[in-house]
C-alpha cells in the first residue's frame, strides 16, 4: 500500500503473513516430464498421491534431477512453480524407496538449494552422517 503525501511517495508495509499456506510437503520419487503444465502436473499428483489435498505441496523432478516442479493446492486453486539448478542436481531419492516421501520445511529448504536434505532434521539439526 502506498500513500502520496507532500509530493513524496510513502510506502506502508503491512504483510499479513505467508501468501500460500503449506502444511505438508510430499516428494514423488518417479521422474516427471518438466514440459508438464498445471493440468498434467495435477493429474500426476492425483495418480501418485491419490488426491491433491488443500495446503499440501507436491514435488517432482526430471530424470536428471536438475529441474524440479512444485504443485501446491492452496485451498482455492493450484499453484505450479519450477526450479532449475545450473550446476549439480537435486538430491532425489531413488524409486526403490517407494512412491512418495514426506519432507519437513527444513528438508525442503535444503532440497531446493541442492543440499543433501536427508541429513537435515527439525530445526536444521544434522541427524545423519
Predicted stretch roles:
Residues 1-129:
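Polybasic/polar functional segments that serve as interface/processing modules
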Amino acid at each position: 500500500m502506498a500513500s502520496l503525501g507532500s509530493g513524496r511517495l510513502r510506502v506502508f508495509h503491512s504483510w499479513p503473513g505467508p501468501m500460500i499456506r503449506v502444511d505438508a510437503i510430499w516428494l514423488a520419487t518417479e521422474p516427471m516430464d518438466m514440459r508438464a503444465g498445471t493440468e498434467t502436473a495435477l493429474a500426476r499428483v492425483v495418480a501418485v498421491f491419490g488426491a491433491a489435498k488443500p495446503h499440501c505441496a507436491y514435488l517432482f523432478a526430471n530424470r536428471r534431477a536438475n529441474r524440479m516442479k512444485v504443485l501446491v493446492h492452496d485451498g482455492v486453486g493450484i499453484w505450479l512453480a519450477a526450479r532449475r539448478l545450473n550446476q549439480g542436481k537435486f538430491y532425489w531419492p531413488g524409486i526403490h524407496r517407494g512412491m512418495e516421501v514426506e519432507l519437513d520445511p527444513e528438508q525442503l529448504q535444503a532440497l531446493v538449494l541442492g543440499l543433501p536434505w536427508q541429513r537435515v532434521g527439525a530445526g536444521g539439526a544434522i541427524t545423519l552422517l
